[in-house]
C-alpha cells in the first residue's frame, strides 16, 4: 500500500518537473505558472467549480480503474464518454419528465451509451479474439467523428454560430448551488459503489483474481468470459 502511494506521488512530481522543464525551454517561469494554476483551481472560491469540472474525468478514471484491475486494457473511455453524452443529449432533447424522473433517466441513458460502445469492443474480443487495446482506441476515433457529425447535422442548433445542440429540457439539468454542481454528489456516490463492489463483493474478487491469474481463476470455476464482458460494460 505504501509503495503504491509512493509510486503515485513520485509520478505526480515527475510530471510537474517535466512540465517545468518544457516551460523553461519555452521561456516561461514554471513557479509563476504553477502558482497561478493552483490559485485559480484550488482557492476556496474556486474549489466547487473545480470539483464540478472534474466529474467527467473522475468517472472515466473510475471506469478505467475497474477494467485495469480486472485484466482488460480498456482505453476507450473518451469514446464511451462521448457516446454516453450523445445518448443522454438525445434523451434530453426529445423527452421531458419531472426532474425527479428526468435526471435519473438521463444518467441511465448516459451509462447505457457508454456501456454499449464499450460492449462493441467486448463482443469483438469474445467472438473474434480481437485485442481490446486496439479496438477501444479505434472506437474512440469513430465516436469522435460520429458525435461531431451528429452535432453538426441532425442535432445542430439552427440559430447557433458554431456546432452545438439545442439545450436539453431544463428538468434534466443537475441542480447547482453557486459554483457547486450536484453532479459531484453523483460522482462520490459512484465512487463508493464501485469501491465496495471491487473490494468487498464476490463479483469484485472474481474480477480482480481474473486479472491477476486467469488460469487459476478458470480452474477455480470463475466464468472468465462472462466477467470480461461485465467489466468492459462497466
Regions from the PLM with identified roles:
Residues 1-13, 127-139, 225-226:
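Alpha-helical transmembrane segments and their helix-start/interface "positive-inside/aromatic belt" motifs
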Residues 2-7, 39-52, 76, 101-105, ...:
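Interfacial loop-to-helix junctions that mark the boundaries of transmembrane helices
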Residues 3-25, 29:
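N-terminal signal-anchor transmembrane alpha helix
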Residues 12, 57, 81, 85-89, ...:
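Residue-level recognition of pore/gate-forming positions within transmembrane alpha-helices
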Residues 22-26, 32, 36-95, 111-130:
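Single transmembrane alpha-helix segments in multi-pass membrane proteins
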Residues 29, 142, 216-217:
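Hydrophobic/aromatic residues within transmembrane alpha-helices
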Residues 132-200, 227:
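Transmembrane helix-bundle core of multi-pass membrane transporters
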Residues 193-231:
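Membrane-helix/interface signature in polytopic inner-membrane proteins
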Amino acid at each position: 500500500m505504501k509503495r503504491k502511494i509512493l509510486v503515485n506521488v513520485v509520478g505526480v512530481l515527475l510530471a510537474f518537473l517535466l512540465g517545468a522543464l518544457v516551460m523553461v525551454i519555452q521561456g516561461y517561469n514554471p513557479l509563476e505558472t504553477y502558482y497561478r494554476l493552483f490559485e485559480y483551481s484550488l482557492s476556496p472560491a474556486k474549489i466547487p467549480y473545480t470539483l464540478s469540472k472534474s466529474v467527467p474525468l473522475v468517472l472515466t478514471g473510475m471506469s478505467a480503474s475497474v477494467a485495469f484491475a480486472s485484466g482488460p486494457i480498456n482505453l476507450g473511455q473518451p469514446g464511451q464518454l462521448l457516446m454516453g453524452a450523445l445518448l443522454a443529449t438525445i434523451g434530453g432533447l426529445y423527452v421531458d419528465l419531472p426532474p425527479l424522473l428526468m435526471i435519473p433517466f438521463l444518467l441511465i441513458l448516459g451509462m447505457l451509451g457508454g456501456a454499449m460502445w464499450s460492449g462493441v469492443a467486448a463482443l469483438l474480443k469474445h467472438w473474434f479474439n480481437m485485442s481490446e487495446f486496439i479496438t477501444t482506441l479505434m472506437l474512440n476515433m469513430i465516436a469522435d467523428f460520429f458525435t461531431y457529425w451528429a452535432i453538426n447535422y441532425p442535432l445542430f442548433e439552427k440559430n447557433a454560430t458554431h456546432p452545438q445542440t439545442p439545450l436539453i429540457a431544463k428538468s434534466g439539468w443537475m441542480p447547482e448551488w453557486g459554483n457547486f454542481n450536484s453532479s459531484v454528489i453523483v460522482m462520490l456516490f459512484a465512487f463508493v459503489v464501485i469501491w465496495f463492489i471491487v473490494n468487498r463483493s464476490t463479483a469484485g474478487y472474481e474480477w480482480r483474481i481474473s486479472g491477476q491469474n486467469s488460469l487459476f481463476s478458470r480452474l477455480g470455476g470463475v466464468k472468465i468470459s462472462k466477467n470480461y464482458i461485465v467489466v468492459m460494460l462497466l
